[in-house]
Amino acid sequence: MSGLAALEAEVRRDLVRLNHPPANWPLGIPAADGTPVLDVLVVGGGMFGQTAGFALIRDGIRNIRVIDRARRGEEGPWGTYARMPTLRSPKHLTGPDLGIPSLTFRAWWEAQHGAEGWERLYKIHRLDWLAYLLWVRDAAARATGRVFHSVDPVVDFGRFRGRRIAVLGANASAFDNAGTALEAGAAKVTMFARRAFLPQVNKTRGMVFSGFLRGFGRLDDATRWRFLTYTAGEASPPPHESVLRCERHPGFRLVFNARWRDVAADAEGVTVTTAEGPQRFDAVIFGTGFTVDPARMPELAAFRDAMQLWGDRVAPEEAARYPELARAPYLGEGFELTPRDPASLLAGALARLRLLGPAAASSHGILSGDIPAVGTGCTTLAREIGQALFAEEVGRHYDAVVAFEEPELAPTPYFVPPEQRLRRG
């Protein structure tokens, strides 16, 4: 046996040695009509979702489901809308393995390419990372839910061959889309940036250590807001590999100080107007990033007015100055939504809803949105959920302790049956 087969045998041995999976300990609370319900539903089966499921099972919380609207292999961005050739993160970082050496990317890579192959590897290819995540899921036997779904639209970049493309924005995803269009044969790609120059330093790289990962969510509001507003003004640069990917194409042009004054589409293409005047393109790619706004999440519509946002925690002028941060949900230490009014009828329901992802970044920092933090974030989430489940069922656990009867001295001459113990004491 060699290669991945040997590694998978090692994984099985490691998990057995770790007593995985442990027995399920939550007692479960049935629905009002008596039907059983899940202890945890994880919505999203990408990197964080599957790792959260694994962390819950590792903690003995097994009555769970992990669901995703995508088909297998299309969860998350890796095989769908991500365009970068390689990950931003260094190859040595861990996370989805939850501290099990045989489940690390390095173990998976070396099983196929040897130690020399690991030394030759510069950074992890995006699709290799996807293949690794799927392997981890299967090797750890932790696929805990069926996947349902229609995928995010996949752009056919082949349509851009010979075309003129405008890209609005100069962040990492903008460069990745520009590079993909150029490699697909686009004749000309013009990128427009509002800034006078590209950001130079990725400040979040200075936050990747255990103290920050574990401690940020427990800081007071003022200190967290200070970090948040500083990093909001210090945009992250695109990786140098993404920039060079575009620069090697003669049809690429990056224009600074170029705010769009107007954009108009017609049957023949798109007209973009800047201070330089109107320019014609065949298509436009918006690389402007994403926003976190609970008001636009239909699944949270019933809780929209009851949930607390960061804008409720800071001075009105601060909220007005940083509207993106102010819109973010204000989460508790266990990633749970918190109520504006603790006496609200929805307060209890909000405590059962936990957000692990970009929406949690304002409350928990990079613990909720990056490869280096996935292991810490998911184990923290599992621990907090376990504490909440235990507290909710503590009365029944007390009764179970009282009823627990596993006589240690039964094989000895000093064994006393329960009924005699009661009479004597």
Residue ranges of model-derived segments:
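Flavin (primarily FAD) cofactor-binding/catalytic cores of flavoenzymes
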Residues: M1-A70, W118, Y122-A184, K188-G425
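Conserved N-terminal glycine-rich FAD pyrophosphate-binding loop of Rossmann-like flavoproteins
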Residues: A70-L98, P199-G215
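Dinucleotide-binding Rossmann-like beta1-alpha1 core, especially the glycine-rich loop
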Residues: A82-L98, W109-R137
